[in-house]
């Protein structure tokens, strides 16, 4: 169940005043998911998904929302944040950080074929290319963190273990120095990919980065 914080039609109607999306037509909780409260929201103008972020570090949300907007703007079928009238992508609803996204089409495929996997591979390649132009911050567990953590433990290691760790760090630095970098999905599995109906698998949505 992924409605941890309930939202009433009256509360949502008031919150939607910050958007130019018309009158609220329908509100329905979404049962899938384990971290956030999600709702299908229909207004006069379009269909949306409302997310109330329950467990996410709120300082990371601007990066996430800007990334989704960037990828959607480059043709990636991911949830596009709906900007409010003042241009903001993030608000607060019932004490939770909240955002409104485009509603994507399709459904998850529980028994994918090789054709589905090929479509996902193409989508990931497109995502990586689009993400390569997005200014991502340093990874919290990246090279700087690895070097700092290794330095803290070196003094408590035996000479042999310290030498082995130093050799591995050097090997990793040499290996990763020439690799491309950029944003990735990082949580890709069947539930997070939507396929539209058709004789050829076509991805309608990539979810929950």
Residue ranges and their predicted role:
Residues 1-85, 197-202:
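Conserved NTP-binding catalytic cores of kinases and kinase-like/nucleotidyltransferase enzymes
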Residues 32, 87-88, 143-144:
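Short secondary-structure capping/turn micro-motifs that flank functional sites
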């Amino acid at each position: 169940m992924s409605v941890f914080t309930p939202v009433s039609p009256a509360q949502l109607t008031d919150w939607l005043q910050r958007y130019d999306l018309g009158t609220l037509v329908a509100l329905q909780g979404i049962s899938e998911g384990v971290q956030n409260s999600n709702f299908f929201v229909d207004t006069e103008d379009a269909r949306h998904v409302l997310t109330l972020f329950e467990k996410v570090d709120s300082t990371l949300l601007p990066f996430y929302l800007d990334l989704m907007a960037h990828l959607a703007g480059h043709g990636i079928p991911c949830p596009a944040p709906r900007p409010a009238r003042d241009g903001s992508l993030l608000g607060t609803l019932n004490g939770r950080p909240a955002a409104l996204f485009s509603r994507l089409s399709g459904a998850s495929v529980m028994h994918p074929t090789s054709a589905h996997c090929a479509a996902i591979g193409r989508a990931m390649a497109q995502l990586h290319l689009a993400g390569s132009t997005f200014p991502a911050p340093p990874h919290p567990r990246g090279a700087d963190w690895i070097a700092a953590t290794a330095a803290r433990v070196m003094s408590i290691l035996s000479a042999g273990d310290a030498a082995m760790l130093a050799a591995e760090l050097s090997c990793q630095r040499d290996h990763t120095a020439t690799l491309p970098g950029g944003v990735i999905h990082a949580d890709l599995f069947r539930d997070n990919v939507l396929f539209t109906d058709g004789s050829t698998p076509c991805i309608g949505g990539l979810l929950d980065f």
